[in-house]
């Protein structure tokens, strides 16, 4: 099965993003837009694994320790570059705990021979993809310009700063991803709770 590790959005943040999408999807009608219910923050993509390997990965993930932390979603950008946009995303902003969690997960599954990440952790929410080649930053060199997001870029520039609110990340999740013509379907296989934030009340 095809798996990855991520963080789900809370309902309020998801609803704000859904309302935003309803207002901007028409500005890039040729793009493949992500369904709001499928939005998530990816911590580590793993790919195809056997059921036995999935269980071994789950066992490693149970050993990962992290406290809950705040995440703010806002701002936007395009991969691989604004001149050759193939992915439209909104930013995810958090303290060092977020990157530390991603690094801990990366190290935990590396014990099973899963390749380590070769680029810095850059959390984001993918909202839409253009057709053709991957929008991965690895395509940065030699990627051809395209006009899929041209109108959207102009509209976004006129909107000012995007802010979809703040949420608390209190767990990370092992997902299964099933590909289909209508878009990927994500199933939550297992949840891994994080320590609650320290109580600062007197």
Model-assigned labels for residue ranges:
Residues 1-202:
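Histidine-dependent nucleotide/RNA phosphoesterase domain, centered on the 2H-phosphoesterase fold
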């Amino acid at each position: 099965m095809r798996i990855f590790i991520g963080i789900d959005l809370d309902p309020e943040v998801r609803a704000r993003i859904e309302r935003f999408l309803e207002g901007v999807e028409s500005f890039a009608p040729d793009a493949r837009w992500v369904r709001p219910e499928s939005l998530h923050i990816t911590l580590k993509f793993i790919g195809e694994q056997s059921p036995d390997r999935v269980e071994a990965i789950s066992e490693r993930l149970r050993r990962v320790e992290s406290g809950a932390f705040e995440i703010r979603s806002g701002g936007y950008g395009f991969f691989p570059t604004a001149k050759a946009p193939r992915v439209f995303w909104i930013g995810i902003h958090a303290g060092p705990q977020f990157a530390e969690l991603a690094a801990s997960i990366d190290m935990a599954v590396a014990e099973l021979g899963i390749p380590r990440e070769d680029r810095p952790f850059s959390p984001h929410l993918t909202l839409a993809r253009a057709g053709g080649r991957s929008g991965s930053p690895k395509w940065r060199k030699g990627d051809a310009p395209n006009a899929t997001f041209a109108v959207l870029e102009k509209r976004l520039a006129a909107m000012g700063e995007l802010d979809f609110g703040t949420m608390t990340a209190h767990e990370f999740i092992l997902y299964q991803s099933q590909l289909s013509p209508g878009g990927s379907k994500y199933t939550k296989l297992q949840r891994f709770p994080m320590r609650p934030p320290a109580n600062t009340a007197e």
